[in-house]
Every structure is written in C-alpha cells, then in structure tokens.
Amino acid sequence: LGTEAVEAHLELADPSLDSAVAQLAAQGVTRAALVPLLFTNAFHNKIDVPEAVREAQDRHGVQLLVGPHLGTGVDVARVLINTLPHSLPAGAHLILYTVGSSDAAANVAAENLAWELSLLSGHTVDVAYATSGPGVGFGGAAVIEAACGYEDVHILPLFVTDGLLLDRVIDQVDHIAVATGARITYSTPLKTALAPLVAARYRAALSELLTAAHA
C-alpha cells in the first residue's frame, strides 16, 4: 500500500486503539484508516469498535476512517481454501472452527461461509463454535461432534492469529482423534494471508472518504 501501518487491539493485548492513536497524534497524524479484523458483524463490530473509535478520536483529535470488517464472503473462503494442505485426501471432511456469537445473524454468516467453502473446495464442511452458537457443545466437544463418522478431518480455524480459544482445540487434537477414530489435521490461523483483504478494506475506507469529500 505504500503507507505506514500499525496494529491496535480492543482487549487482551497491547497496544490498545487509544494507545496506537495517541502515538499517531504525537507524530502529527490527523487522519487514519482503520480496518476491523473481525469476521462477523456481531457485538465487537457493532458496539466495541465504534465506541473505541469515538473515544480515541475525541481524546486525541485524529479522524479515524473505519473501513469494512473482514466479513465472511467469497474472498475469505478463498483464503481459507488456500490454507488446505495439498496432501489432504479428496474425501476429507472440513470443520470451520470459529468463535461463535450470541448474535444469531453472526452464526448464520459462519454457516453461509461453510456452505461457500463446500462449493469451492468440493469437501463437506461443518461449523464448530468455540464459545457460543447453535449446538449442544462448544470447543473440543463441538469439534468431536462434527468429526464423528469421518475418516479424515481437517480443522480450518476462522481466526486471524493464535489465541487461547484456538489453542484449547489444537492442544486436544490427539484426544479428538482417539474419541472419533478420525485422522485429524489442521491449518494455522490466517495471519498474513489476510493482507490482500485488509488492503481492499483500506481502499474502501479511502473511497468512502473521497466520495464524501465530493458530495
């Protein structure tokens, strides 16, 4: 993109958005684009991000142009498919492992992404939720339920990076294999594979700014 990029976090990690914006303000920056690294339009995207943006703008005088979140569209599905190992058997079952939400629409978006993954990859796909969502179990229990009846299972994490929720399942892979009788493999979090999508959301934020300027 040819521009400086900094990271910021809503919670559980540093720097916070407020700290990152304070640093930008100290450097003389008056305007910055912000891309929420969120897949679904649930509480974090609807409430937490706008609130953090308002507070940082008011405190430091830096205008934040908020672009679209990552979403669960075809571009995300293609990034996920690109993480599949070439050695994956043709009949392997995929489990899209995602955080889950109390927002039903967010979980529907994850289910729709699983459907898109199945269309694009030719594999069967189920969704397993880490914390909340439809189903009787979460985390490792949800993965076991989704893996039963298949010989080869590959876990696709819908995660930007490593973290406790994902570690809890990856650390249980051997147990899941014993419980289901399946051969279990897994992809790593998406990390830098998301860079083209982040760039596209950044451009969308700039486009919105230019449109507003000429309105």
Task: Set out the residue ranges of the language-model regions.
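Active-site-proximal alpha-helix that buttresses catalytic centers in soluble enzyme cores
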Residues: L1-A215
